């Protein structure tokens, strides 16, 4: 069983390398037309250049997974902001794409919790489609839209989970098919359990990104031993292995909050269930210390008898 690792957005080991520098709309409004254009251009350019630095860092450390920052283009989906963020940076998008393709990196996006398809308010669905389209356009500009995924949560329950799920199935029909083809769903820590998310994924033929921390915070009746094989099966129509999210609680009191690093003892039960399936899968680390937490966790895992480190960020068990 091969386990490959990655992390989210910021490389903590790199100095001044945020790929998510931004500008608020309030600040944006105070600028002249030319100043607005210059500010958007400068901030986006810096985010793209920082992304390139991060990719070089990942390549050097043989880190095969990476989640791009959704804030890579500031105010990209704001209705009052017009900005050709694709055409203005074609060489940089292509440079990012070349690095990703040459080194066979697995890239993803994870829009925020407001990108959802369960609402009874049409404008919420419209905004979700706009946001998904933005993420897809970025992946397309990079040249990896057909091999990368945009991960979201199911959404809210709005007092009636069954009706909300029905709305999801209806509202998702409005998302263009080529974008839906590149989306994944993740179980959340308060509303939609692993079993409920799995059922939706199976009906819509959407790959399921399983989050173990969320699962433990929002348990369902079905045991993980039964759920995980079915979760992995939702990836069978793709040409890539399943991906899971790993983090551990900040504390017992703040169980849903992410800790700085990974608590191996918290994760061990999941790993033992995965080992029984013995299926290759990828792991996205969602701890606060990102790449540093990932590398420390890999080091801890590699010290367990039977687990072999076969590259800087890949283990075999």
UniProtKB/Swiss-Prot annotation:
HAMAP family: UV_endonuclease. The keyword Acetylation does not apply. NCBIfam families: uvde (TIGR00629). Belongs to the uve1/UvsE family. The keyword Hydrolase applies. Component in a DNA repair pathway. Removal of UV LIGHT damaged nucleotides. Recognizes pyrimidine dimers and cleave a phosphodiester bond immediately 5' to the lesion. GO terms for biological process: nucleotide-excision repair; pyrimidine dimer repair; response to UV. Keywords: DNA damage, DNA excision, DNA repair, Endonuclease, Hydrolase, Nuclease. GO terms for molecular function: endonuclease activity. It comes from the Bacteria. Pfam families: UvdE (PF03851). Gene3D superfamilies: Divalent-metal-dependent TIM barrel enzymes. The lineage of its organism: Bacteria, Bacillati, Bacillota, Bacilli, Bacillales. This is UV DNA damage endonuclease. It is an enzyme of class 3 (hydrolase). Its EC number is 3.-.-.-. Disulfide bonds: none annotated.
């Amino acid at each position: 069983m091969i386990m490959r690792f990655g992390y989210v957005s910021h490389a903590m080991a790199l100095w001044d390398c945020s790929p998510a520098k931004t500008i608020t709309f309030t600040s944006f409004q105070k600028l002249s037309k030319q100043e607005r254009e210059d500010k958007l251009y400068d901030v986006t350019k810096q985010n793209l250049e920082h992304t390139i630095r991060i990719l070089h860092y990942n390549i050097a450390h043989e880190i095969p997974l990476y989640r791009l920052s959704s804030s890579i283009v500031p105010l990209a989906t704001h209705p009052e902001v017009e900005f050709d963020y694709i055409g203005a940076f074609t060489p940089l998008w292509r440079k990012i794409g070349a690095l990703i393709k040459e080194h066979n990196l697995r890239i993803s996006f994870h829009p925020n919790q407001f990108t959802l398809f369960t609402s009874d308010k049409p404008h919420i669905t419209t905004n979700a489609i706009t946001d998904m389209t933005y993420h897809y356009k970025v992946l397309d500009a990079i040249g990896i839209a057909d091999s990368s995924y945009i991960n979201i949560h199911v959404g809210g329950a709005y007092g009636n989970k069954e009706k909300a799920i029905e709305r999801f199935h209806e509202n998702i029909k409005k998302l263009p098919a080529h974008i839906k083809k590149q989306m994944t769903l993740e179980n959340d820590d308060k509303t939609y359990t692993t079993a409920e998310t799995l059922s939706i994924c199976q009906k819509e033929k959407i790959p399921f990104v399983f989050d173990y921390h969320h699962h433990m915070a929002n348990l369902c009746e079905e045991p993980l031993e039964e759920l995980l094989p079915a979760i992995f099966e939702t990836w069978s129509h793709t040409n890539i292995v399943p991906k899971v999210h790993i983090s551990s609680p900040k504390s017992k009191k703040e169980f849903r909050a992410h800790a700085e690093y990974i608590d191996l003892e918290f994760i061990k039960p999941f790993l033992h269930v995965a080992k029984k399936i013995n299926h290759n899968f990828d792991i996205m680390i969602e701890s606060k210390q990102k790449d540093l937490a990932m590398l420390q966790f890999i080091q801890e895992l590699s010290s367990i008898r039977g687990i072999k480190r076969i590259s800087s960020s890949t283990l075999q068990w």
